[in-house]
Amino acid sequence: MYPGEALYIVSGSVPNLKSTPLIDEWFGLLYRDGQFIQRLSMEEVVQKAGLRSARIPNTNCITNQSIVAASSLLHDVVTQAKTYLTERYQQYQAEMNPKLDAEVDKLIELQEKHKEYYQTTLFEHERQLQEQERRVDKLFDDFTNWVKETLTIQNNPYIRIVSVLMGVSE
């Protein structure tokens, strides 16, 4: 890394409606002289920072002024991370919404088949038929809600700044 560069390693996740992260990514945000340059994958972070080398970077080379400068960028780092995770959210929605709709349609179709079965086998027993239809409705409503809550994500990412790597003069 060059002097004046700061590489923020970020962990970001986007949960479903049950608070389980469905998008969970680590990435880097590269700044040069206080300006955002680009987002990097973790593989690019490892290469850029030389983390695979035997030499430990930045050992006792960071000044208080550098720490203050890196801290002053945290608001922008969070904004950049939110922007990226919002893009990932939109990609997920575009990919999953048709799948979710198809899954719900299959459940509705299966629910109708169950109702038809009970209507043909219990047509003489009105009370039992109504009871079975209520049971089928509740079962399918519960399962449909579970599918929706499991596959639907919230655009409310959890962002954690894991580390800041800085380029220094040797």
Segments and roles (model prediction):
Residues 1-170:
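Charged, non-catalytic accessory extensions
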